[in-house]
Amino acid sequence: MAQASLLACEGLAGVSLVPTAASKKMMLSQIASKQAENGERAGSPDVLRCSSQGHRKDSDKSRSRKDDDSLSEASHSKKTVKKVVVVEQNGSFQVKIPKNFVCEHCFGAFRSSYHLKRHILIHTGEKPFECDICDMRFIQKYHLERHKRVHSGEKPYQCERCHQCFSRTDRLLRHKRMCQGCQSKTSDGQFSL
């Protein structure tokens, strides 16, 4: 990434803009033309920082070493979530969170240590959440809560067309895709031909 131009804005804490290969040339040419307008030397900075006064290049001497050290410490903080913004040639962009936590069993990658720990339960077979009625066990608390609806008979998800109720959202979505009668009903409850 020596030639890539990265933008890190104070307004977007922990976010870096990373241009794609196609957009690098366009972005670098825009930076070079802006530098020429301002009477600055030609060339592309590796990193641009946004400030309330405008853009600031890494080569600027106005920033102290203390500022650099505090920036470095903030970027290595465990609570800081790094986000990468990928800029396309047409100007659109996507925010991506790198998957830095890797499972040693299957090499699956995850965005947080929580998600990795939850995933490892699949490999260990551990199911810490147990139903107090039927002794079924689950990896996630949400799955246990969803299972308990079987015993209680609760069906909180309702089809807005035919008013049939379901205990799970995936069952409601399947119903909406599969039920032809539901799709052809009119608002007054009559079937249309």
UniProtKB/Swiss-Prot annotation:
GO CC entries: chromatin; nucleus
Region (Disordered): 33-75
Keyword annotations of the record: Isopeptide bond, Metal-binding, Nucleus, Phosphoprotein, Repeat, Transcription, Transcription regulation, Ubl conjugation, Zinc, Zinc-finger
Alphabetized SMART domains for the sequence: ZnF_C2H2
UniProt main location, coarse: nucleus
Cross-link (Glycyl lysine isopeptide (Lys-Gly) (interchain with G-Cter in SUMO2)) at residue(s): K34
PROSITE patterns attached to this UniProt entry: ZINC_FINGER_C2H2_1, ZINC_FINGER_C2H2_2
Localization: Nucleus
UniProt GO BP: regulation of transcription by RNA polymerase II
Annotated GO MF terms: DNA-binding transcription factor activity; DNA-binding transcription factor activity, RNA polymerase II-specific; RNA polymerase II cis-regulatory region sequence-specific DNA binding; sequence-specific double-stranded DNA binding; zinc ion binding
Composition-biased stretches (Basic and acidic residues): 55-69
Phosphoserine carried by residues: S44
Zinc finger regions, C2H2-type: 101-123, 129-151, 157-179
PANTHER family attached to this UniProt entry: EARLY GROWTH RESPONSE 4-RELATED, KRUEPPEL-LIKE TRANSCRIPTION FACTOR
Protein role: May be involved in transcriptional regulation.
Entry similarity comment: Belongs to the krueppel C2H2-type zinc-finger protein family.
Name the record gives this protein: Zinc finger protein 740
